């Protein structure tokens, strides 16, 4: 695969439409359930199916979530907006139109900043403009039998459980230039939505779906090229790979004298390429007009201000604070703040007295390894933040070794025990009494007279051997600093 870096003078222009399922218990215009995984066509009713005589009523929790999402993305929330009907005919749309927002969306003109870490390049921050956020209803889902798409299938089934679920569609400006930037942007959008609690952002379940619009041009000042829409990417790595493939495909096509046509393409994860799906529609094809069953949306200033005060500290602000105030590296801050429960656990442990860097190392190292191995989350383990802080303080004070702390960690996580109590119960406290350590070393050296003689004759590497035997004899409990000091005192003393 040829990357854009190998095509001198070419630039990619990328924008992303992110469809976020808002995590309300009921759908956007009806009380039908939004529960994922229920039997097909059980979460439907006459409103979802568009039966004659039914009228939609806006779910106020959807409005709240959409406004909070807009505020977190620095969008300007409109005092007045409306719903429109987007006309198109497809089996997954029972009404033959989708209720969306066209020329008066709920919010416009925002931005977020994303941190881009390219391989072998320094991390940089880039501001990505956001054109708009609008509310709309989701469509149903087609299940193709005999193929993963309509072409080649024996027949198709329709599940309308997803139809009518509330979506916030977030449309970026064409400010992205690489697949990596596109993936980081989408990841930051999901992170923000999760921090807000307005969506779980689960890409595998379709809670967050991204459509990428991409074109290439010869130079930064050249007009935009013909854009291609890419669908069917269910991970951030897929977004990056799809962009990189499509950039190379378009450049190759243009260099070969081929014409790029405006179309929608699908990303094939197995083959690692995009394939043509259909020609791309334009806005006029949908024949938008105001929905006559839904009145205008008016959001009073008091209500907007109340929702604004409920916003949490957002990921970018939290990352910056961890670096500036707690001294974490940019990398550590990114990892700790990636999921809100981990960040909350981290802050609770800091409050309980843990040193920030040591705490970050434990969370990113042994604890994350345990979580991954046992397929659990930080919110599900029994080890409380205060108990992890206690463990770190015990290590810092020299009361236990890091090795012993690692050994008892699984039991602490599984049982939620006090580290001090467990250490006392198992007799694992560090031996730091000088006289006790001296006595143990003298007894130990008496077992290795030849090695002691060799050390005194200049074979100083044997010090490591003696330390190893001492740790073995004390089960790793002898204080290393004190032990080394006393060991050298005895070994360097005269044989008499």
Swiss-Prot record:
UniProt-listed SMART domains: GatB_Yqey
InterPro entries linked: Asn/Gln-tRNA_amidoTrfase_suB/E, Asn/Gln-tRNA_Trfase_suB/E_cat, Asn/Gln_amidotransferase, Asn/Gln_tRNA_amidoTrase-B-like, GatB, GatB_C_1, GatB_Yqey_C_2, Gln-tRNA_amidoTrfase_suB_CS
Residues annotated as transmembrane: none
E.C. code: 6.3.5.-
GO BP annotations, alphabetical order: glutaminyl-tRNAGln biosynthesis via transamidation; mitochondrial translation
GO molecular function, one term: ATP binding
Family: Belongs to the GatB/GatE family. GatB subfamily.
Function: Allows the formation of correctly charged Gln-tRNA(Gln) through the transamidation of misacylated Glu-tRNA(Gln). The reaction takes place in the presence of glutamine and ATP through an activated gamma-phospho-Glu-tRNA(Gln).
Entry protein name: Glutamyl-tRNA(Gln) amidotransferase subunit B, organellar chromatophore
Naturally occurring in which organism (per UniProt): Paulinella chromatophora
């Amino acid at each position: 695969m040829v990357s854009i870096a190998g095509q001198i003078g070419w630039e990619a222009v990328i924008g992303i439409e992110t469809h976020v399922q808002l995590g309300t218990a009921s759908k956007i215009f009806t009380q039908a359930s939004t529960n994922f995984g229920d039997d097909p066509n059980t979460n439907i009713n006459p409103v979802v199916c568009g039966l004659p005589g039914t009228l939609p009523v806006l779910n106020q929790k959807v409005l709240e979530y959409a406004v909070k999402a807009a505020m977190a993305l620095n969008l300007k929330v409109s005092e007045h907006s409306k719903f429109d009907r987007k006309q198109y005919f497809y089996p997954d749309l029972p009404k033959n139109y989708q209720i969306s927002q066209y020329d008066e969306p709920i919010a416009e003109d925002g931005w977020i900043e994303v941190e881009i870490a390219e391989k072998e390049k320094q991390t940089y921050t880039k501001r990505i403009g956001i054109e708009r956020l609008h509310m709309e209803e989701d469509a149903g889902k087609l299940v193709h039998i005999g193929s993963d798409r309509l072409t080649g299938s024996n027949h198709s089934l329709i599940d309308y459980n997803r139809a009518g679920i509330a979506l916030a569609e977030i449309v970026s400006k064409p400010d992205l230039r690489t697949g990596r930037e596109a993936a980081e942007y989408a990841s930051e959008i999901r992170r923000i939505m999760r921090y807000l609690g307005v969506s779980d952002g689960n890409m595998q379940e379709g809670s967050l779906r991204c459509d990428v619009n991409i074109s290439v041009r010869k130079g930064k000042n050249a007009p935009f090229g013909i854009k291609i829409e890419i669908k069917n990417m269910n991970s951030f790595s897929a977004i990056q790979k799809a962009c990189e493939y499509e950039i190379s495909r378009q450049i190759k096509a243009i260099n070969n004298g081929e014409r790029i046509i405006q179309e929608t393409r699908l990303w094939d994860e197995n083959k690692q390429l995009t394939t043509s799906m259909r020609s791309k529609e334009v806005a006029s094809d949908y024949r938008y007009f105001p929905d006559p069953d839904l009145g205008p949306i008016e959001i009073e200033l008091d209500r907007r201000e109340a929702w604004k005060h409920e916003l949490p500290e957002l990921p970018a602000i939290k990352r910056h604070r961890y670096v500036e105030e707690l001294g974490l590296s940019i990398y550590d801050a990114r990892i700790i703040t990636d999921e809100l429960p981990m960040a909350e656990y981290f802050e609770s442990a800091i409050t309980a007295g843990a040193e920030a860097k040591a705490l970050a190392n434990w969370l990113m190292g042994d604890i994350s390894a345990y979580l991954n191995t046992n397929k659990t989350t930080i919110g599900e383990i029994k080890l409380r933040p205060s108990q992890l802080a206690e463990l770190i303080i015990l290590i810092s004070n020299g009361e236990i070794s890091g090795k012993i702390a690692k050994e008892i960690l699984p039991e602490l996580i599984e049982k939620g025990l006090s580290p001090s109590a467990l250490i006392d119960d198992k007799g694992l406290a560090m031996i730091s009494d000088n006289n006790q350590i001296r006595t143990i070393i003298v007894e130990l050296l008496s077992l290795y007279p030849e090695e002691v003689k060799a050390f005194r004759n200049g074979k100083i590497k044997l010090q490591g051997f003696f330390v190893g035997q001492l740790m073995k004899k004390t089960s790793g409990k002898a204080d290393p600093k004190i032990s080394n000091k006393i060991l050298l005192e005895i070994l360097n003393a005269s044989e008499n």
